[in-house]
Amino acid sequence: MRRIMINASLCDGCKNCTVACMQAHRDTPGTVYDLDLTDIHNESRNHIEKMPDGSYRPIFCRHCDLPECVMSCMSGALSKDPETGIVSYDEKKCGSCFMCVMNCPYGVLKADTATHTKVVKCDFCMKDDAKPNCVKSCPKKAIYVEKTTDEAAKLFGINSNAVGYVVSDDEPDD
């Protein structure tokens, strides 16, 4: 299965991944040049944090093997696909209790700013059926998709059928 991998040492904090995510999920047609970055109805599903040492860390949903968000979701709005490993969100089922937000150990999930009635989370750009837009937009190739093998799963302590990311200092394979 595919995983979003992060080489944090290559990230320069440009936020192209954040803007690409917003562009991919916008409701109105247009280009990135007319994208309203302050539109609270179109929030990015990822963000970049600047660390005290000046380095940057891309923060993405890890689509965990044992996702706390799914286990704490009382309405069944969050589920993990056993085939792809992707944690999906069904807005129609969401009861807006935000237990998932409170239980995400990585602080990735958040309530939407506009209505405070739904959760904003990565969907791996499933509509595109290609590389996620954050990956396509990264000029430094700090974000990349990699097929996970059993060997990688053992090394990183992950399920080879999972989707998510691992902070890595290794160069991505092209």
Describe the residue ranges of each PLM region.
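N-terminal beta-strand motif that seeds the catalytic metal site of vicinal oxygen chelate
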Residues: 1-9
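Aromatic-flanked redox-active Cys/Sec active sites in thiol-based oxidoreductases
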Residues: 8, 75, 91
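Flanking helices and flexible, charged tails adjoining ferredoxin-like Fe-S electron-transfer domains
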Residues: 27-63, 67-71, 91-174
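Ordered, amphipathic secondary-structure segments that act as subunit-interaction surfaces
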Residues: 63-86
